[in-house]
Amino acid sequence: MIQLTNRQARQFLLLKHRLLGEYQYIGKQGVLNFIRQAGCIQYDPIDVCGKNAELVLQSRIQGFTKSMLAELLYEDRSLVDFPDKNLAVIPVEDWPYFERYRQAARQHAKRYPEMEALIEQVRAHIQNHGAISSDDLQLDGNFAWQSAIHWSSGNNASRSVLEQMYSTGELIIHHKKGTRKYYDIAGKYIQPNLLNRRSLWRASLSITSGGYCVESALLDLYGIASPTPG
């Protein structure tokens, strides 16, 4: 085991997260490269002096502008919003790593049989009209929904059904207007080789994104995904 002093550990984390020295990433391609090496960046809609994702990138990417992140998410589709740590921005190629989350959401959906008919309505509406937000379709439902994979919950049927379909991976965020999310069918934007690949192994992703992993965190990860044989 490698022994580090507290100072060495601090230096390592600052280097890992690209907070020491000169800029190592430039422009739009630099945004993509940084997020790939970091694993993800958390999205937070609170905007006091800038949203979290924008502040993270501004401090690390030379020449960063907000439009770069929006283009990578909603035009190039090289990145995707994913309900991890509430909402995070991940490289689209990491989609298979989160299949266990989507499986949990599908199992969780069985608690809400009244959603089935409403989900069909959403599918039909998107088929006919394209990407929608919870304001575009008023669904009638009398149930209190709780997400299986993050803190979201509520009694608004339209929002709950869209969030549930988003949690299972059937929908993705097509774009945002301010903090309002618009959803569309994931299969339109994620390549089949990624959309249908089943990878239950997340520990290596979490370790490489954080730069370290303590024993308790690793045990927690093993509760989510077992190591690959051999």
Where are these regions (language model features)?
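Long, low-complexity intrinsically disordered regions
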Residues: M1-G230
